[in-house]
Amino acid sequence: MRGRGNARSSQALGVSWCPATWHPRLDMGRLHRPRSSTSYRNLPHLFLFFLFVGPFSCLGSYSRATELLYSLNEGLPAGVLIGSLAEDLRLLPRSAGRPDPQSQLPERTGAEWNPPLSFSLASRGLSGQYVTLDNRSGELHTSAQEIDREALCVEGGGGTAWSGSVSISSSPSDSCLLLLDVLVLPQEYFRFVKVKIAIRDINDNAPQFPVSQISVWVPENAPVNTRLAIEHPAVDPDVGINGVQTYRLLDYHGMFTLDVEENENGERTPYLIVMGALDRETQDQYVSIIIAEDGGSPPLLGSATLTIGISDINDNCPLFTDSQINVTVYGNATVGTPIAAVQAVDKDLGTNAQITYSYSQKVPQASKDLFHLDENTGVIKLFSKIGGSVLESHKLTILANGPGCIPAVITALVSIIKVIFRPPEIVPRYIANEIDGVVYLKELEPVNTPIAFFTIRDPEGKYKVNCYLDGEGPFRLSPYKPYNNEYLLETTKPMDYELQQFYEVAVVAWNSEGFHVKRVIKVQLLDDNDNAPIFLQPLIELTIEENNSPNAFLTKLYATDADSEERGQVSYFLGPDAPSYFSLDSVTGILTVSTQLDREEKEKYRYTVRAVDCGKPPRESVATVALTVLDKNDNSPRFINKDFSFFVPENFPGYGEIGVISVTDADAGRNGWVALSVVNQSDIFVIDTGKGMLRAKVSLDREQQSSYTLWVEAVDGGEPALSSTAKITILLLDINDNPPLVLFPQSNMSYLLVLPSTLPGSPVTEVYAVDKDTGMNAVIAYSIIGRRGPRPESFRIDPKTGNITLEEALLQTDYGLHRLLVKVSDHGYPEPLHSTVMVNLFVNDTVSNESYIESLLRKEPEINIEEKEPQISIEPTHRKVESVSCMPTLVALSVISLGSITLVTGMGIYICLRKGEKHPREDENLEVQIPLKGKIDLHMRERKPMDISNI
């Protein structure tokens, strides 16, 4: 899938056009200008001008070619707007906007002119592949065929490939053009437009090396700062900053570094720079990973294995380990018998390590004739039969010659023992595989594996011969019965190639005359695949931060195998339990992860990796990778609800627990630590960060405010910190904490004149009270609890409305002051609250002496309190509480509270309006307003208004 990270707006970023000389018929922008009255007067002249120059201008228009340039990113989806030819050619005013493709372009309308234009490609060609042209609006869009800049414009193409009306132009620079020829019709507005669309490159290709293994040879005598070009540099089809920008080594070994040089064409070549002195004899090879990185955002990487070989120079000469050897030769030795061998060592390689052996010029010719020196192997053999005149001692000076070196010198002192009798003979018969005197054994051969039979005999047949095994090694030489003088050489314990690869022992025989003979046996062990690869650590513990970049490096696995050659070559593989997005390079052991890891999705990964050698059969070992994804602060605190609602009874004590605000943060450690705070209303509410408990600092009164809306912010402890908010709604539930407030009558000292002619059943006055509570706490009942007067039982009060009516016809004896003590009680639970008010009714025809009435009102009445509950048809609310959930009741009370507030407000407005309509008349009841005192005080002297008190 092609990346679209750099895709920008569909609007073309650059537009340039080159029109010919302006002509009134072709410049549509001029036709939209408002005409003045003068232009109408010049119409005849303008008509003649058009008639004369029109044909020439038409011919001129065919010769005009307009060029437009647009640019867009490669890889855009279908339907992205590239540009509008009509607007960019100024065939339509830009303020007019784009025409509706379904609508007909208007003809001449008054002073404006919109020509019916059409747009088409000169020929189809490849146009349907990459762009589409709207024939009416002239809008260019991308087609369903995705534009791939790397496929269209091959670097270095240098030219233009035409196909019909669409062509591809590329050059060694990073420009890539899509060329189109567009015709604008009808003929009288004809234009031939060349459209160039520059395709901008996006970083959709990673650098890639042509080969996975790159080898560089460096002479071991290369001085510091030697620069060596690395062949096969990485290739990136992208251009510009998206191409290869830099190279780096994953492991420098302290000996090398990389530099990048750029040539005139912008090509970057990596150079290997020597940083220290090299010695092939110390280390002949360095292996590292070379990484190529482009300049995109984010950058893409490519890698290959870089093997740096150290080539040999002739900086070492042959050396002998000893300066002198002593050799004994018996006079009866057979011609051609090797008597000794010298060997020098040269640490160089190839021709630099070739050694030839020769005698020094000081060696006498007689010694040279008696002993032959092989110039290639250094073996000294008896060249002629030892005669009686041969010297008993010879000094052989041998030179080891290397190219360009001073010869190394060793001296062989040869002593000749002249004998009359022949020494014992040792005749071997090999059972194991023997080549050129070397026996080859597999390391896994069992104990007591036979190697060879040896026959020990005296050539003269006169002397007894004994033998033994000389040398160290897991071998045993024992007589092989029932045969005499037959001996078997066999192994005594298992052999391990990894501990010792080569053994040298000798079978020594001697007779009773003291003659000794030995036969050297060389044993070379052959390696078996008996060792499995071993990881340095059986448990590989790794860490990586979440939201890592793709193909992030985790570690480089390393396992050793003690076996040799291909049996010791190790390849690395992921175990079957490893997730698919982990990758392991089988050669280098580099472990990477191809995708971003999310700690909140999975924090720990545990899977196996295998190290397998190339033996037959292969052996393997397993290690466990334990990867821990480290946390980043990439998650905001999250409330369990977006909105929280709490129902709290009013008068709730300060710092009481209202409710718990639950919030979580998927991050870990400090990134997941959340602090809560109240954003608004912080002067009233506070929240406990540790528990998330919301508390009110003060007691809440529903009558002052029935609900609160506040916002709580949760902030984590990351850097930078992340936050989120939640809405908290607190609804106060009403409790019966307000007694009814009597609004009328306004004073215990007020009275009302009742005419004796008032008919029974007629309303006389009313008691009106309100309660600030809601629900049943605000339902008011009225009752008369005390009476005083001539016949005060003549009046009754409606328990629901508080209306006081006349029960019986008034008699002559009923004249005077009637005093009714009215109790106004709510239906609160568990304890109803109430207030009282004194209603004074003066029965008389007129009020002739107000001072007399006032004196009566000042006297404290002797009233017997009647504790009668008013009988009103209200459903009982204070029933026995059942063990059910309180939530439905709380919700219902909240609804009733809100409704009651609305009802009380409406009633207050109604009373105010009603009082405004009342006008006192002479024939109506006379009401005298007397100040109210806190308690029932009939001896008031001051007319100071006060509230009615609770009893």
From Swiss-Prot:
GO terms for molecular function: calcium ion binding; RNA binding. SMART domains: CA (SM00112). The keyword tRNA-binding does not apply. Residues 64-209, 210-320, 321-535, 536-639, 640-742, 746-863 form the Cadherin domain. It is a single-pass type I membrane protein. Potential calcium-dependent cell-adhesion protein. This is Protocadherin-20. The gene is PCDH20.
